[in-house]
Amino acid sequence: MEPQHDSTPQHGSSGVTVVGMGAISALGPTARHLWDGARQGQVGIRPVQAMEMNGLDTKLGGEVTDPVEPSRGYRHPAGFRERSIELALVAAEEAMAALPAGLVAPERFGVVLGTCNAGLLAGREWLRAVRDGEVPDPELALLVTPQALAESVGAAFRLRGPVLAVNTACASGANAIGLAADLLRAGRADAVLAGGSDAFSDVCFAGFNALQSLSPEPATPYDAGRQGLSLGEGSGMVVLVRAGFAREHGLTAVADIAGYGLSADGFHSTAPHPEGRGAARAIESALRLSGIGPEQIGYVNGHGTGTPKNDPAETNAIRRALGEGWAARTPVSSTKSMIGHMLGAAGAAVAIVT
């Protein structure tokens, strides 16, 4: 038996609630588009239009084709736009609209945002300038690092509470929501904007192509004939407050954050543990924190990338955490078959659509 070392607090509801949501994805420019599209089984994975796909194993992706035009600005060089930040601002503006202006003091309003690749486009532009014998615009240096996403969004809304950047690969958006709930439980903020954002880039596609992870057809998670993943882009954002704060100010609660868990496989740089050990520990931690038993789970929106190694490992993790009996009774699916794998935004988008 594997030894267990888990310091997760074992108590009931965290007392944290979602009062605002925003999203932009291949299914449309709002959280409502994401929700309705997922309910109807719409597939937003189609031929990518905004970049060359030559030499790749796929021509498809969950591309945002709606205009990405946030009303709030951010600091950037003339003639260059960092798409991941603009996607985040569009989703954040929708989520923040749920709160009356001035309800939360800027010093008590936090930001926790996750991303895998925000800044790649800025880095690519820097390298292009160097290659072409130009002097790169110093402003690009402010956008290259992952924290630029959280910093830019926080500044756009003039928020002066804790501003944190999460860069934990494909779990970034989900971890951001969990860490935001921790800030609220600890009394370090009265409201937190949390979520994730990532945009398409040729570097990202090339990386997954090198891993031989891309499917030539739209991804089919958990299917016996799955061929790999479909990349997606976009952003998902939620506004979290303590449940008591929501009641006191008459805010509509969309959902509660009952609990979350963090763990690592420590197994391989690109492959999950085949038995799903790390993922199972995260699920078990989330259940302990929330006080929820396996028999109370009505549905699992899984990671479900559609790769040959991920889906069996994740299935094993669910079985380990819930037990064979309850795992067999619990419906599991993945929205990545509709919006693609949004990387650092994936966990936030999954939370919204669930």
Residue ranges with predicted function:
Residues A50, P106-L113, L164-T168, V192-S197, ...:
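Beta-strand segments within the central parallel beta-sheet cores of soluble alpha/beta enzyme folds
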Residues M1-P77, G244-D256, I352-T354:
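ACP-dependent fatty acid/polyketide chain-elongation machinery
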Residues E2-M21, F80-A105:
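N-terminal amphipathic, basic-rich helices that act as targeting or association modules
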Residues F267-G276, T305-L322, M342-V350:
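Short glycine/threonine-rich loop-to-helix capping motif typified by GTGT followed
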Residues Q10-S14, R46-V90, A118-L179, R188, ...:
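Conserved catalytic cysteine-centered active-site region
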Residues A180, S235-A243, A348-I352:
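Alpha-helical metal-binding/catalytic segments enriched in His/Glu/Asp
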Residues G15-V19, Q42-P47, D57, P218-S290, ...:
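Condensing-enzyme catalytic core mediating Claisen C-C bond formation in acyl metabolism
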Residues E93-F109, A156, F245-T252, A282-Y299, ...:
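Phosphate/pyrophosphate-binding loops at sites that engage ATP/ADP/AMP, CoA/4′-phosphopantetheine
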